[in-house]
Amino acid sequence: MFKLCVFVALLSLAAAAPAPAPAPAPAPGLIGPGIVAPGIWGPTVVGSPLLAPQVVSVVPGAISHAAITQVHPSPLLIKSVHGLGPVVIG
C-alpha cells in the first residue's frame, strides 16, 4: 500500500510539472529575404542581402540560364528563369 501511495504521489508530481519550453524561433530578418529556387536535391536558397550584400549577378548551377540581380539592399530580383518564364521578386 505504501508503494502505491508513493507511486501515485510521484505520478501526480510528474503530471503537475510544466512542459519544457519550445526552442526559440530565429529572429525574422536574421538571414534576410532570399530566393528559394528549385535544385537538383530539393529547394536551394540562392542568396540574400545579408549573406551576399555585394552580389550583382548570380547564376546558380541548379537553375539553367538564370539572371538574378540585386537592387541596393532590397531583396533580390529575378529577371528570368529558363523554363519558368519571367519571374519578379522584390
From Swiss-Prot:
Residues 1-16 form the signal peptide. The keyword Signal applies. Keywords: Amidation, Neuropeptide, Secreted, Signal. GO terms for biological process: neuropeptide signaling pathway. Its main location: secreted. GO terms for cellular component: extracellular region. It is found in: Secreted. Residues 17-54, 67-79 form a propeptide. Coiled coil: none annotated. One of its GO terms (molecular function) is neuropeptide hormone activity. The modification Isoleucine amide is found at I89. This is Neuropeptide-like 3. It comes from Drosophila melanogaster (Fruit fly).
